[in-house]
Amino acid sequence: MTKTESKQLEVLRFIHERVQDKGYPPTVREICEAVNLSSTSTVHGHLARLEKKGLLQKDPTKPRAIELTPAGLTAIGATPQKIPVLGVVTAGVPILAVEEATDYFPLPPSLQTEQDLFMLTIRGESMINAGILDGDEVIIRKQSTADNGDIVIAMTAEDEATCKRFFKEADHYRLQPENDTFEPIILNEVSILGKVVGLYRDRM
C-alpha cells in the first residue's frame, strides 16, 4: 500500500467514525486536522480520488453530504448493515403485500443508526412528482403512525399496500398520489406500515 492509499484509508475511517458518533460527516477542515494533512486542498484531492474509486459518494445538492459506499466500508473493514427487501409495492393501483424478504440491501451509512428498516421496490408512476419513479427501491422505517404530508406505505382494508402521501382529514384518511393523472384514495380506516426515509435508484 502506498503512502497516499494509506492516507486515503485514514480519511475514510475518520469520516465513518464521525458519522457513527455524531450522525453527520466532518468538515473538510476537520478531516485535514484529524489526519494531519497540510491543507484543505489536499483533502479535496483525496476526497475526489476516493469518490472516483467508488469508495465515497457525495450529494452535490447538500453541503458536507459525504458518506462511504458499501465498497468504502469494506475497505476499512466495517460491515455495512443490511436491511430486508420485502418485494414490490405499488405507486398506482394498490397490490397485495407479501412480507417475505427477497434480498438484503446494504444500508447507506447515513441511515446506519436507524432501527426497523426495510425496503420495497416501487411499481407504477403515481409518485413521480415526489421523485419516486417506477423501479425505484424505497427505504422504509417501520412505524404505525404518520404526520400529514409524510410519504408512507399504507395498507387498505383489503390488505393491499400502496405508497402515497398521507393526510388525516375530518372524517377520513386521504392517500394522495404525486401525479395529477391519479385520483386520491379515500379511506375510513388505514394501517400505516412505515414512513419512506430513503430511496435507491440503480443507475446502470
From Swiss-Prot:
SUBUNIT field: Homodimer.
Organism of provenance: Latilactobacillus sakei subsp. sakei (strain 23K)
HAMAP family listed in its UniProt record: LexA (MF_00015)
InterPro entries: ArsR-like_HTH, LexA, LexA-like, LexA/Signal_pep-like_sf, LexA_DNA-bd_dom, LexA_repressor, Peptidase_S24_LexA, Peptidase_S24_S26A/B/C
Reaction equation(s) it catalyzes: Hydrolysis of Ala-|-Gly bond in repressor LexA
Protein family membership: Belongs to the peptidase S24 family.
Keywords, ordered alphabetically: Autocatalytic cleavage, DNA damage, DNA repair, DNA replication, DNA-binding, Hydrolase, Repressor, SOS response, Transcription, Transcription regulation
Gene Ontology biological process: DNA repair; DNA replication; negative regulation of DNA-templated transcription; proteolysis; SOS response
Chain positions of site Cleavage: A91, G92
PANTHER family attached to this UniProt entry: LEXA REPRESSOR, LEXA REPRESSOR-RELATED
Molecular function in Gene Ontology: DNA binding; serine-type endopeptidase activity
Tree of life domain: Bacteria
Portion annotated as DNA-binding: 28-48
Top EC class for this record: hydrolase
Record protein name field: LexA repressor
Known function: Represses a number of genes involved in the response to DNA damage (SOS response), including recA and lexA. In the presence of single-stranded DNA, RecA interacts with LexA causing an autocatalytic cleavage which disrupts the DNA-binding part of LexA, leading to derepression of the SOS regulon and eventually DNA repair.
CDD domains: HTH_ARSR (cd00090), S24_LexA-like (cd06529)
This protein's record includes keyword GTP-binding: no
Active site positions: S126 (for autocatalytic cleavage activity), K164 (for autocatalytic cleavage activity)
E.C. number: 3.4.21.88
DNA damage found in the keyword field: yes
